[in-house]
């Protein structure tokens, strides 16, 4: 929204100023989208519903995002980017590979389960196969490659077995969302450590 020389803001105003909300409009849209996409479903959620949940008019929403796809893409990338950045750091360290693999698993589970909404469930949406989400898929592939590299360092597996164990470990980590959803009151840190222990057993490390 623009500001006149006299200090008056011009442009489309927010439909509702939600009391106690200090986030910027884009963050509020992402929060609203996360809730609606995971509770109602992506296809069943309209841009109008997202805007209203964020406390603004639908037309105002387009000042901040291009639409539902942009919101979904950013939400998906938020589940991968922190773990990918950490994986790159761990790959560069000289600690035992087994310890680094355990730490990546633990941290990744905390990212996936630490949020208020089950964003990992969005991975299964058919829309994610579209070109708009290529960046997310590339980041996810790079993260999986980091897992493979650490499993390879921590074990002496042949390529075929290495690929299988990597698939199983990666599947365990991404699948924990469903387990966590069945008991959301379980402490995430405890759950993350237990999952990392299980991942090492699966890898044979």
PLM-predicted stretches and their roles:
Residues 1-12, 144-157, 172, 178-205:
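C-terminal peripheral helix-coil segments that are non-catalytic and often amphipathic
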Residues 28, 32, 36-70, 74:
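Helix-turn-helix
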Residues 28, 99-107, 164-172, 190, ...:
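Amphipathic alpha-helical interaction segments
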Residues 74, 85-114:
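Hydrophobic alpha-helical connector segments
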Residues 81-84, 130-156, 162-167, 190-193:
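Amphipathic alpha-helical packing segments from all-alpha helical-bundle domains
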Residues 100-103, 109-134, 148, 178:
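Amphipathic alpha-helical segments used for helix-helix packing
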